């Protein structure tokens, strides 16, 4: 004891990766500001995929009191090719919870009492709402959104509409009012 210990300066760049033992580096020793998504390895950050947004290429008729699957046959985007435009079905094949939205613009006139919009998983209703039609409106939008749990890689989701006017009514094809979309929730 009684001896002084001196320190020497290490030149900038004097310590390379070969001198650092991986076990000595912890995330607590790395400043938060030094960690950016650009510096992380590809695939390390979670994403909201698979995801899709589909619309209709033309109007579609809804028969009276008949649940009808909507023909969303045009993809605006489909990150993982999980939406099928031939059967109008989203099969994510990745287990998880999905935020799903379905909207339709119905050209109805004054004769509709109620309209239902439904989201079905594997052929059964999982989300459904019945909305009264506002008499006198020539067109009205109907929408449903919610979280659907896909617990199996074969689970699929479809969008259905129904109306009770006593006659056939058209769903109007518009990108902003008649659409079907979904994305996986991160961490769910």
What role is predicted for each listed range?
Residues 96-106, 141-145, 155-162:
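Extracellular beta-strand-rich recognition modules
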Residues 152-157, 178:
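A short pocket-lining beta-strand/turn micro-motif at the edge of beta-sheets
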Residues 42-112, 124, 129-131, 167-188:
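Terminal (often C-terminal
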Residues 1-36, 42, 177, 183-186:
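Short, low-complexity N-terminal tether/leader segments at secretion or assembly junctions of large
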Residues 113-117, 155:
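Short beta-strand/loop motifs in extracellular/secreted proteins, especially
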Residues 118-152:
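Glycine-rich strand-loop-strand elements at beta-sheet edges
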């Amino acid at each position: 004891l009684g001896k002084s210990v001196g320190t020497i300066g290490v030149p900038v760049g004097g310590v390379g990766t070969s001198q650092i033992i991986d076990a000595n580096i912890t995330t607590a020793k790395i400043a938060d500001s030094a960690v950016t998504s650009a510096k992380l390895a590809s695939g390390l950050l979670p994403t909201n995929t698979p995801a899709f947004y589909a619309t209709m290429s033309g109007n579609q008729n809804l028969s009276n009191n008949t649940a009808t699957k909507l023909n969303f046959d045009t993809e605006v985007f489909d990150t993982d090719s999980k939406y099928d435009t031939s059967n109008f079905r989203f099969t994510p094949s990745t287990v998880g919870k999905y935020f799903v939205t379905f909207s339709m613009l119905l050209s109805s006139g004054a004769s509709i009492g109620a309209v239902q919009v439904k989201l079905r998983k594997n052929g059964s209703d999982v989300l459904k709402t019945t909305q009264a039609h506002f008499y006198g409106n020539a067109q009205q939008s109907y929408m449903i959104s919610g979280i659907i749990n896909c617990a199996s890689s074969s689970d699929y989701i479809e969008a259905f509409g129904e109306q009770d006017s006593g006659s056939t009514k058209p769903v109007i094809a518009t990108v902003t009012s008649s659409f079907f979309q979904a994305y996986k929730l991160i961490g769910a």
